[in-house]
Amino acid sequence: MGLSDGEWQLVLNVWGKVEGDIGGHGQEVLIRLFKGHPETLEKFDKFKHLKAEDEMRASEDLKKHGTTVLTALGGILKKKGQHAAELAPLAQSHATKHKIPVKYLEFISEAIIQVLQSKHPADFGADTQGAMSKALELFRNDIAAKYKELGFQG
C-alpha cells in the first residue's frame, strides 16, 4: 500500500501547485464535496444554510475552512506516510467532536482528485493521479485505524 519515492515526488510536485492558491483549491474541493454529496453539508453548522453554488463561492468562511483542510492535508502528505503524529489529533477531532464517517473522507478524496484534474490537467496525468489516489487512500486507511482505536464506528 505504501508509495514509492517516485510516487511521493509526483504527489508533492502537484501539491506545490495547490499551495500556490490553497484557498481557491480548498473552496473548490468543498463546493464539489457539498454538491456531489449534499448529506456532507449537514456536518457543517457554519455552512449548512449554503444551498446554492453562488452562495458557497461568496462565503469567506467556506474558503477559510477549505484552506484549513488542504493545509492540514498538505502537512500530512509531506510526511510521505510517516504521519502518525499529524494524524492523531485530526482523527481524534473528526471521530469524537465532528463525527465524520470514513465514507465522507472518501467523498472529499474524490473531490480533491476532480479539482486537481480540472485545475492542473497538464500536471495531473495518469501516473500522478494514481499516486495521489494511493496517498489519499493511505491517509483514509490510517484515519480509519485511529477511529477504530477511539471506538468510533465512522
Curated annotation (Swiss-Prot):
Residues recorded as bearing Phosphoserine in the entry: 4
Q: What is its main location?
A: cytoplasm
Pfam family example for this protein? Globin
A GO CC term?
Answer: extracellular exosome
Q: Which GO terms describe its biological process?
A: removal of superoxide radicals
Where is nitrite bound in this sequence?
Answer: 65
PROSITE patterns associated with the record:
GLOBIN
Q: Which SUPFAM superfamilies match?
A: Globin-like
- Tell me what reaction this enzyme catalyses: Fe(III)-heme b-[protein] + nitric oxide + H2O = Fe(II)-heme b-[protein] + nitrite + 2 H(+); H2O2 + AH2 = A + 2 H2O
Q: Name one GO molecular function term.
A: peroxidase activity
The cross-references to CDD domains, in alphabetical order and at most eight, read:
Mb
UniProt xrefs under Gene3D superfamilies:
6.10.140.2100, 6.10.140.2110
Q: Which PANTHER family match?
A: MYOGLOBIN (PTHR47132:SF1)
Describe its assembly. Answer: Monomer.
Name it. Myoglobin
